[in-house]
Amino acid sequence: MAIKTYKPTSAGRRHQTCSAFDEITTSTPEKSLIVTIKKTGGRNSFGRITARHIGGGHKKKYRIIDFRRNKVEVPAKVASIEYDPNRSARIALLHYADGAKRYILAPLDLKVGDSIVASSNADIKPGNALPLRAIPLGTIIHNIELKIGKGGQLARSAGTFAQLMAKEGKYAQVKLPSGEVRMVLLDCMATIGQVGNIDHENVSIGKAGRSRWLGRRPKVRGVAMNPVDHPHGGGEGRTSGGRHPVTPWGIPTKGYKTRKNKTSTRFIVKKRSK
């Protein structure tokens, strides 16, 4: 994937970059695999904001992605590589030998016409899905399950990957993109390769309006608010907030650890480094 730059015809264009979309082969999604999604504006069923800075954005149709890869032993051909407005990665449309059609996350180097399969004895090549027990140590993987049959939950963003480090008992040790090493059951599925669109991290939004197209609303600083809205608010003239940085709810931020101990903590072999 290449990054497209623009001539500085305006202040917003000057530093703006975007994907060249070279790998996209069609602009029309598969109709049977799209559904309408309703916008929430970050509100819950009571109408209260539960996720800040969400709202607006271009209208989108949701593409149903096969994260489970549970169509085993049935070979499929890659029919197209498509843009998905709901995620940073590209998606690949698969045509299975039995006539079924499904979308998967498009790994790096997957091309139209390639044949892939989900099987415990599949080849170790990008796009093939196998249980962790059948994958050799050191292999680059993505779309990793945490619970058997639930579908991939780890390493799904553009350019991300994990690495299989060890196998011990009924668990595999997987190094995640954050640097964390975690134990995952050997019967959990994972897909071979790195997620495509690896230059996504180099894209510069360029202007505020483009963030609004993506459904992201402005983030207002606490010190710019009134005391009723934020612990840092108020004061005569510009102030520093007058205390150590906190969230709008008074919880210390900027380095303060907020993760609670939970059942899954025992599966973490090494804490994240990022």
Swiss-Prot record:
Domain of life: Bacteria
Family named by the database record: Belongs to the universal ribosomal protein uL2 family.
Assembly information from the UniProt record: Part of the 50S ribosomal subunit. Forms a bridge to the 30S subunit in the 70S ribosome.
Source organism (scientific name): Geobacter sulfurreducens (strain ATCC 51573 / DSM 12127 / PCA)
Protein name: Large ribosomal subunit protein uL2
NCBIfam families registered for this protein in UniProt: rplB_bact
GO terms, molecular function: RNA binding; rRNA binding; structural constituent of ribosome; transferase activity
Ranges where the record places region Disordered: 223-257
Function: One of the primary rRNA binding proteins. Required for association of the 30S and 50S subunits to form the 70S ribosome, for tRNA binding and peptide bond formation. It has been suggested to have peptidyltransferase activity; this is somewhat controversial. Makes several contacts with the 16S rRNA in the 70S ribosome.
Keyword line: Ribonucleoprotein, Ribosomal protein, RNA-binding, rRNA-binding
InterPro entries (alphabetical): NA-bd_OB-fold, Rib_uL2_dom2, Ribosomal_uL2, Ribosomal_uL2_bac/org-type, Ribosomal_uL2_C, Ribosomal_uL2_CS, Ribosomal_uL2_dom3, Ribosomal_uL2_RNA-bd_dom
One cellular component (GO) term of this entry: cytosolic large ribosomal subunit
Keyword Ribonucleoprotein applies: yes
GO biological process annotation, one example: cytoplasmic translation
tRNA-binding found in the keyword field: no
